[in-house]
Curated annotation (Swiss-Prot):
Heterododecamer (2C3:3R2) of six catalytic PyrB chains organized as two trimers (C3), and six regulatory PyrI chains organized as three dimers (R2). Pfam families: OTCace, OTCace_N. Belongs to the aspartate/ornithine carbamoyltransferase superfamily. ATCase family. The keyword Transferase applies. Coiled coil: none annotated. It comes from the Bacteria. This is Aspartate carbamoyltransferase catalytic subunit. One of its GO terms (cellular component) is cytosol. The gene is pyrB. HAMAP family: Asp_carb_tr. NCBIfam families: asp_carb_tr, PRK00856.1. Keywords: Pyrimidine biosynthesis, Transferase. Its EC number is 2.1.3.2. PROSITE patterns: CARBAMOYLTRANSFERASE. It comes from Pseudomonas entomophila (strain L48).
Length: 334
């Protein structure tokens, strides 16, 4: 674990409700299940002619993305809008941070504008945790991805995808394949799978892209794709994160595809009803071939749909927990 793994008291209020969503580390199975159940209920909202519920009416959600991600930002915006919140998305490249204003000052100014919640994405591990603990403790903070550390909403939308296609986690074999070393998605998925009772979690990749000590997550390590995929129920493919790599970690993208790219032939080693997932963006012909990404085993587009519902669940639950804590503090101050 990194030193930034979220402490339970910071993420939960005194009643055990979610108030920030920073990491899946330390969160109990019951809370993860509540998030999944709540997200399931929000899937129905997305099927309506009018895709809105009034749970966050009058609240302001600020998306503060210091690292680009069109898919994540858009699904958070849709989630907040479907909850009837007012949404501000800060374009950091044109904001005052590019003029020398610090992260601290930027967020304090947004808080002064009566923001109720921040969705933060940052290239530094621990950024969301720092903001929740030291910058804006009275504003609900949702981690939209921080460095290599965590991407908890992606982890939960992956769990919702698995649960809706496979039911219980307790008899599943799940393989996570690719650049494990640089992937915050891999870390969040491993934590969630372990907490939800998955007995067989496998990570597959070249030795140079598997972190030392990863066994502490309760996973089995494979450096041979065929061996690692044997009889699995779920395959989660990850892209090569070149932007986070130092030189020499792998020979070439072509070499990676030759050894670890998911093809129809290689997928045949998994169970016949295995599902294939990918957090995106997909690099076709690098970690996965088009015939698999677009084939009958792929649930990649389902992940996008479920992501909106999961983010609706997290936003609504964190806002409720933050409000409950504020009321609790006021009552105890009297």
């Amino acid at each position: 674990m990194t030193p930034f793994d979220a402490k339970r008291p910071l993420q939960l209020n005194d009643q055990g409700q979610l108030r920030h969503f920073l990491s899946l580390d330390g969160l109990p199975r019951e809370l993860l299940t509540e998030i999944l159940d709540t997200a399931d209920s929000f899937l129905e909202v997305g099927a309506r002619a009018v895709k809105k519920v009034p749970l966050l009416r009058g609240k302001t959600v600020c998306n503060v993305f210091f690292e680009n991600s069109t898919r994540t930002r858009t699904t958070f915006e849709l989630a907040a809008q479907r909850l009837s919140a007012d949404v501000i998305s800060l374009n950091v490249s044109t904001s005052s941070t590019s003029k020398g204003e610090t992260l601290f000052d930027t967020l304090r100014n947004l808080e002064a504008m009566a923001a109720d919640m921040f969705v933060v994405r940052h290239s530094d591990s621990g950024a969301a945790h720092f903001i929740a603990e030291h910058v804006c403790p009275d504003v609900a903070v949702i981690n939209g991805g921080d460095g290599r550390h965590a991407h908890p909403t992606q982890g939960m939308l992956d769990m919702l995808t698995i649960r809706r296609h496979k039911g219980s986690f307790e008899n599943l074999s799940v393989a996570i394949v690719g650049d494990i070393l640089h992937s915050r998605v891999a870390r969040s998925d491993m934590l969630a799978l372990k907490a939800l009772g998955c007995p067989d979690i496998r990570v597959i990749g070249p030795k140079t892209l598997i972190p030392i000590g990863i066994e502490q997550y309760g996973v089995k390590v494979y450096t041979d794709l065929a061996e690692g995929l044997k009889d699995v129920d779920v395959v989660i493919m990850l892209r090569l994160q070149r932007e986070r790599m130092a030189g020499g970690l792998l020979p070439s993208e072509g070499e990676f595809y030759r050894l670890f790219g998911l093809t129809t032939a290689r997928l045949a080693g998994a169970k016949p009803d295995a599902i294939v997932m990918h957090p995106g963006p997909i690099n076709r012909g690098v970690e996965i071939e088009s015939a698999v990404a677009d084939g009958k085993h792929s649930v990649i587009l389902n992940q996008v749909t479920y992501g909106i519902a999961v983010r609706m669940a997290v936003l609504s639950m964190a806002m409720s927990g933050q409000n409950a804590q504020r009321q609790f503090d006021q009552e105890n101050a009297q």
